[in-house]
From Swiss-Prot:
Ranges of biased composition (kind: Low complexity): 69-84
Recorded superkingdom: Eukaryota
Gene Ontology CC annotation, any one: nucleolus
Protein name per Swiss-Prot or TrEMBL: Rab5 GDP/GTP exchange factor
Lineage: Eukaryota, Metazoa, Chordata, Craniata, Vertebrata
Molecular function terms, GO-annotated: DNA binding; guanyl-nucleotide exchange factor activity; small GTPase binding; ubiquitin protein ligase activity; zinc ion binding
Species this chain originates from: Mus musculus
Length: 491
């Protein structure tokens, strides 16, 4: 997969992300550019060719040995009887060895050896009882999920149980062969549900996700970064490579992200967190989910910076920058684990497959990164790699202090503190003003109440002259009109 470095940044033709056989699915560097389906076909063909070539070589060597032995027998007919008996004994031993090897590969021998392996490797009841809490939880969730599918769920559970019981006896196989067994299991279960169970595709996908979660939670510690592979060696190599490239700046990669914008800076931190969190997950689908979340944070950061949707040419350089800045633990082991044991349909299509393929491209670019990729001279690249100097140091010497990333962040924080101080002083002044207004308002209300009380007292004073009773003698009653004049009755 060719990676091009141009003035506007790193560019990868989107067609190069697809399977090189032209089937339309996403390819993978671990599969030599093929998709999962085409890679398995090519792998089987290559394996059959290798077996045929090995068989032909063995037959040719056997014929040459027999011819050489026959020739030596005819030329040494005059030798002593003792030597002839010695040769005869040697031939008998060789024949016996060949017979033993043939018996070993016979059906009865395979059955016997399998029985011995089962007796030797069958897990004891005590080991079965020592299951982790997470495994028990996942198993319970898996059973509860399958209950909703009735007969299909029972069949799926039966097949899954048989697969898990058979895997411990395959640990002597190479990790590629164990991966092939797992991929065959995925394919057989999915095909059986579609053909026999007539299960809709969307439900098949959900069931396959639960199957993957169930079996890989149980097999994780046996198949992730096994000792028989060089995964750990590759992890150390890529970590060392990333540490050596600590001097690479976003400008060299033409990363369209401005980390001075707070929202963008937050997105970058979240993207790094997600790519690092990938190592803590057990299920391939969960690891892919971390890659997908990381990629979406990258797209959001680019969108905020450019005020427009991000393109694929913007995404890949930024993903490379995130990987360099985060240096995720056991990166190669996680990529290999996903490649070997993830449901292949998830890697061949969809956003998960697209983002995973881009991550593989980013790692491949980092491994092959050179001076031309960064638009640098070979001399500068060598000096940066050797640690003699750093572009960040040169920038700090030639630029004003506020241009350095660390100093710039410090000034930014000081500016924020200054703004907070101004806001606090403004709030304090407003609070004091409010307090004074409340005091003035209280005094004003008290004065108004006092004035009203003085003007309209609450206590009613008795009148200076007594009030005239209606039946009392009043000289002024005569002045009233006749209807209103009081009448006096003698009691």
């Amino acid at each position: 997969m060719s990676l091009k470095s141009e003035r506007r940044g790193i560019h990868v033709d989107q067609s190069e992300l697809l399977c090189k056989k032209g089937c339309g699915y996403y390819g993978n560097p671990a599969w030599q550019g093929f998709c999962s389906k085409c890679w398995r076909e090519e792998y089987h063909k290559a394996r059959q060719r290798q077996i045929q070539e090995d068989w032909e070589l063995a037959e040719r060597l056997q014929r040459e040995e027999e011819e050489a032995f026959a020739s030596s027998q005819s030329s040494q007919g005059a030798q002593s009887l003792t030597f002839s008996k010695f040769e005869e004994k040697k031939t008998n031993e060789k024949t016996r060895k060949v017979t033993t090897v043939k018996k070993f590969f016979s059906a009865s021998s395979r059955a016997g050896s399998k029985k011995e392996i089962q007796e030797a490797k069958a897990p004891s009841p005590s080991i079965n009882r020592q299951t982790s809490i997470e495994t028990d939880r996942v198993t319970k969730e898996f059973i509860d999920f399958l209950k909703t599918f009735h007969k299909t769920g029972q069949e799926v559970y039966k097949q899954t149980k048989m697969f898990l019981e058979a895997m411990p006896y395959k640990r002597d196989l190479s990790i590629e062969e164990q991966s092939e067994c797992t991929q065959d299991f995925y394919q057989n279960v999915a095909e059986r549900m579609q053909t026999r169970g007539k299960v809709p595709p969307e439900k098949v996908e959900k069931i396959m996700d639960q199957i993957e979660k169930h079996i890989m939670t149980r097999l994780y510690k046996f198949v992730f970064c096994p000792e028989t592979t060089d995964d750990e060696k590759k992890d150390l190599a890529i970590q060392k490579r990333i540490r050596a490239l600590h001097w690479v700046t976003p400008q060299m990669l033409c990363v369209p992200v401005n980390e001075e914008i707070p929202e963008v800076s937050d997105m970058v931190v979240k993207a790094i967190t997600d790519i690092i969190e990938m190592d803590s997950k057990r299920v391939p689908r969960d690891k892919l989910a971390c890659i997908t979340r990381c990629s979406k944070h990258i797209f959001n950061a680019i969108k905020i910076t450019k005020n427009e949707p991000a393109s694929a040419d913007d995404f890949l350089p930024t993903l490379i920058y995130i990987v360099l800045k985060g240096n995720p633990p056991r990166l190669q082991s996680n990529i290999q684990y996903i490649t070997r044991f993830c449901n292949p349909s998830r890697l061949m299509t969809g956003e998960d497959g697209y983002y995973f393929t881009n991550l593989c491209c980013a790692v491949a670019f980092i491994e092959k990164l050179d001076a031309q990729s960064l638009n640098l001279s070979q001399e500068d690249f060598d000096r940066y790699m050797s640690g003699q100097t750093s572009p960040r140091k040169q920038e700090s010497e030639s630029w004003p202090p506020e241009a350095c990333l660390g100093v710039k962040q410090m000034y930014k924080n000081l500016d924020l503190l200054s703004q907070l101080n101004e806001r606090q002083e403004r709030i304090m002044n407003e609070a004091k003003k409010l307090e004074k207004d409340l005091i003035d308002w209280t005094d004003g209300i008290a004065k108004e109440v006092q004035d009203i009380v003085e003007k309209y007292p609450l206590e009613i004073k008795p009148p200076n002259q007594p009030l005239a009773a209606i039946d009392s003698e009043n000289v002024e009653n005569d002045k009233l009109p006749p209807p209103l004049q009081p009448q006096v009755y003698a009691g």
